[in-house]
Amino acid sequence: MEIEKSNNGGSNPSAGEEFKDMIKGVTKFLMMVIFLGTIMLWIMMPTLTYRTKWLPHLRIKFGTSTYFGATGTTLFMYMFPMMVVACLGCVYLHFKNRKSPHHIDRETKGGVWSKLRKPMLVKGPLGIVSVTEITFLAMFVALLLWCFITYLRNSFATITPKSAAAHDESLWQAKLESAALRLGLIGNICLAFLFLPVARGSSLLPAMGLTSESSIKYHIWLGHMVMALFTVHGLCYIIYWASMHEISQMIMWDTKGVSNLAGEIALAAGLVMWATTYPKIRRRFFEVFFYTHYLYIVFMLFFVLHVGISFSFIALPGFYIFLVDRFLRFLQSRENVRLLAARILPSDTMELTFSKNSKLVYSPTSIMFVNIPSISKLQWHPFTITSSSKLEPEKLSIVIKKEGKWSTKLHQRLSSSDQIDRLAVSVEGPYGPASADFLRHEALVMVCGGSGITPFISVIRDLIATSQKETCKIPKITLICAFKKSSEISMLDLVLPLSGLETELSSDINIKIEAFITRDNDAGDEAKAGKIKTLWFKPSLSDQSISSILGPNSWLWLGAILASSFLIFMIIIGIITRYYIYPIDHNTNKIYSLTSKTIIYILVISVSIMATCSAAMLWNKKKYGKVESKQVQNVDRPSPTSSPTSSWGYNSLREIESTPQESLVQRTNLHFGERPNLKKLLLDVEGSSVGVLVCGPKKMRQKVAEICSSGLAENLHFESISFSW
């Protein structure tokens, strides 16, 4: 009877699911309306209609208050709407995450949306870009061009030889100064979006179906635009001042208007960051790239001091959301987490297993940032989570490949003969998609190279857990993996967890693995004899299980933080302005120091964010701390020097009982000395909807994207997972 009920629920959504869909639809509609309204303001901003009709009316309505003064205009026009959108996004994601596992969102079923997500450009400076991404990029560039051309046309129309002579300028100098100003205005539009892709816990990205990792390329594009526009903006002003014999303007700090020196400091910080993003520098000297990016604090601080707080609110909403996310990550990273065990594979791969709060739920392909102070106190590195919160509710695992200096030091420490009782670790995350609707496909093909297999381990484990606990149909799984050496086959041992499975894989799981070893012609002695070393740690009682900093209802709490911190900010600023600034300045903006006013706003924003985030964290820690204390496991375990060898490469030499691992081995085909024929393997997969995921080298991702976009098979739906930034 229970099975019949579940099956009916899979095809006919319950009233509860329909209500959630309705709430999601309403919130997403409101988000879209408000966001499009903000875009409309940007479109109208350079026009004469906005300047002569809209702006005077808006200033009378919002800019004459004794509580906010002239700042109220941009505060309520740009800052307030985006905060509402972010809060609505939190509500949307809360209900989205509450859907049943067999319920498929209407927007993910396919059709036109699936075609728009197909790759359009495979090779080139932009990387692999879909039709949707190209469309939005073109629309954004069109917005920038529209604003710049309209600004110039309207400003140049007022510049005449007579007006230029009145300011002791030639015509070209007046036009150069006008163009320089407009370039800065266009840069502010790009800056408004710059920090949203790197706000890992933001509600805006997952509400649009994006993750922070997949959105890094948008941050890169926007970063290049911002720095290009601001650099030309600064150079034009330097040329203008030099031609006017006013080069001393470069060191001017006007406390009642624009501070040139502050702008130059901001630009210098931005140029240092921009220089380290050069691919060769970023890849060879990642630490330099990583550390110099902390100059964003200097960049934003002096940008606000340069233009003043009132104009900054046009570009500050994204940075405000980023600050909330950044401080929450800071609070989470202050605690050490409980590291239970480490496995070292023959392929120089390490699996770290942590204790996890059972209420922490994350989606497959999520990542987590890890810091190990004994190796480096400052470096944080992202790693893919390989475990499934459904299959292993109290454990979380990540896989680390020995490649750079940091991972090499970790491998040396874990491999040393000296016994390690404890390893202090701090984490940030997990971060990932709000949901992963793999069930919408009839078949799932995962193509990976080397350590690119790690995100797919979590996908497979999640589908296995779903097959054990739910009655929905599981897609056929094909894992195509390419390794350089036979010793790397041992990474397939990580596909299944050490515990949490039944005696055999469920018959509902139709999984096939095609493993290609490109440089070896057989398994080799190293792969046959390689031992898997396992270490068990004895964590300190002060170590915490990994948990969400805001508890199980994290999206609602994030919305509450955004709303309350912004409300507190407005209340405090309203009081300060009404009873301190207004009696001095009377809304003239000519008496009270603009620099002092800006610093007050920055301090109030910082205090509001820190206070609300800390209060929310302490509340959730107090509420769910008791649950976590009951999860403390007996960590006084032996530390064996090695465990059984890998299941691959020698299975024909031994007889073992039926286990999930052996069941997986039987479904694996090993191909030595050859590369996968991706075109044949992908086109041979049957099904009306085939999800194709790829994670690996750039050429592999491009090849798979080219096949999926070629039109040879309309049923292939491409998705790339890249961590090469």
From Swiss-Prot:
Note what the entry says on domains: The C-terminus is probably located inside the membrane.
Asked whether the UniProt record includes Transmembrane among its keywords, one would answer: yes
* Source organism: Arabidopsis thaliana
GO annotation (BP), single: response to bacterium
Which InterPro entries does the annotation name?
Answer: FAD-bd_8, FAD-bd_FR_type, Fe3_Rdtase_TM_dom, Fe_red_NAD-bd_6, FNR_nucleotide-bd, RBOH/FRE, Riboflavin_synthase-like_b-brl
Q: Which gene is the coding source of this polypeptide chain?
A: FRO2
Q: What does this protein do?
A: Flavocytochrome that transfers electrons across the plasma membrane to reduce ferric iron chelates to form soluble ferrous iron in the rhizosphere. May be involved in the delivery of iron to developing pollen grains. Also acts as a copper-chelate reductase. Involved in glycine betaine-mediated chilling tolerance and reactive oxygen species accumulation.
Q: Name one GO molecular function term.
A: ferric-chelate reductase (NADH) activity
- Protein name, entry field: Ferric reduction oxidase 2
**What residues does the Ferric oxidoreductase domain cover?**
183-303
Top-level class of the enzyme under EC nomenclature: oxidoreductase
| UniProt: FAD binding residues | H381, P382, F383, T384
Residues assigned to the Cytoplasmic compartment are 1-28, 94-125, 242-291, 360-554, 620-725
Q: Which residue stretches are annotated as topological domain Extracellular?
A: 49-74, 150-217, 317-338, 578-597
Q: In which tissues is it expressed?
A: Expressed in the epidermal cells of the roots. High expression in lateral roots and root hairs. Detected in leaves, stems, siliques and in flowers in anthers and styles.
What domain of life does the native source organism fall in? Eukaryota
* Induction remarks: Circadian-regulation. Up-regulated in roots by iron deficiency, carbon monoxide and by treatment with glycine betaine. Down-regulated by zinc, cadmium and cytokinin. Not regulated by copper.
Q: Record-annotated residues binding NAD(+)?
A: G429, P430, Y431, G432
Miscellaneous section: Post-transcriptionally regulated by iron. Coordinately regulated with the iron transport protein IRT1.
Q: Name the family the entry cites.
A: Belongs to the ferric reductase (FRE) family.
How does a null allele present?
Impaired growth on media with no added iron. No response to glycine betaine in chilling assays.
Write out the catalysed reaction.
2 a Fe(II)-siderophore + NAD(+) + H(+) = 2 a Fe(III)-siderophore + NADH
